[in-house]
Amino acid sequence: MAAGRLRILCLLLLSLHPSLGWVLDLQEASVADKLSFGKMAETRGTWTPHQGNNHVRLPRALAGSCRLWSLTLPVAELGLGYASEEKVIFRYCAGSCPQEARTQHSLVLARLRGRGRAHGRPCCQPTSYADVTFLDDQHHWQQLPQLSAAACGCGG
């Protein structure tokens, strides 16, 4: 009974502060914008959208523009050696980036690419990060600095 109360208290505390790793709305806004249907099912830490007829269609993260995506993962699945039954929200950046220049750096790099002197393309990457905090199996708070992307942009 005490363990149940402790879990409820922890969930309440985590839901009050979004930087602690739990957000009540587990669905990222960009995911909702990308999908025209609403029912989502969690499968081993990845979100798989479903239509009414149970036909599975995967989101095309790389087909859209660069944006922030979310996965709800068990802490153990992060692969960082922590023992915890908690789940955290891991945010990452994915999507395509236009070739057009937005900064002086991008302008020069595009020109060098055109001459064959630089390689690659602009890529979607985090522009800022957020810490993730969770309760481990020993009932100690663990904070993982800069684990999750907080914002995305095109670079390179």
From Swiss-Prot:
Q: Entry's Pfam families?
A: TGF_beta
**Taxonomically, which superkingdom?**
Eukaryota
Q: What span is annotated as the signal peptide, if there is one?
A: 1-21
| Effect of inactivating the gene | Mice show normal development and behavior, but are hypersensitive to focal cerebral ischemia or stroke.
Known function: Growth factor that exhibits neurotrophic activity on mesencephalic dopaminergic and motor neurons. Acts by binding to its coreceptor, GFRA4, leading to autophosphorylation and activation of the RET receptor.
- Record's PANTHER family? GDNF SUBFAMILY OF TGF-BETA FAMILY, PERSEPHIN
Organism, by scientific name, is Mus musculus (Mouse)
Keyword Acetylation carried by entry: no
Instruction: State its location(s).
Output: Secreted
A cellular-component GO term for this protein: extracellular space
Give one GO molecular function term.
growth factor activity
Per its record, how is this protein called by name?
Answer: Persephin
Q: Which Cys pairs are S-S linked? A: 66-124, 93-152, 97-154
Keywords, sorted A to Z: Disulfide bond, Growth factor, Secreted, Signal
Q: Which family does it belong to?
A: Belongs to the TGF-beta family. GDNF subfamily.
Subunit-structure text? Homodimer; disulfide-linked. Interacts with GFRA4 coreceptor and RET: forms a 2:2:2 ternary complex composed of PSPN ligand, GFRA4 and RET receptor.
Coarsely, its chief localization is secreted
Q: Tell me the Gene Ontology biological-process terms attached to this UniProt entry.
A: branching involved in ureteric bud morphogenesis; glial cell-derived neurotrophic factor receptor signaling pathway
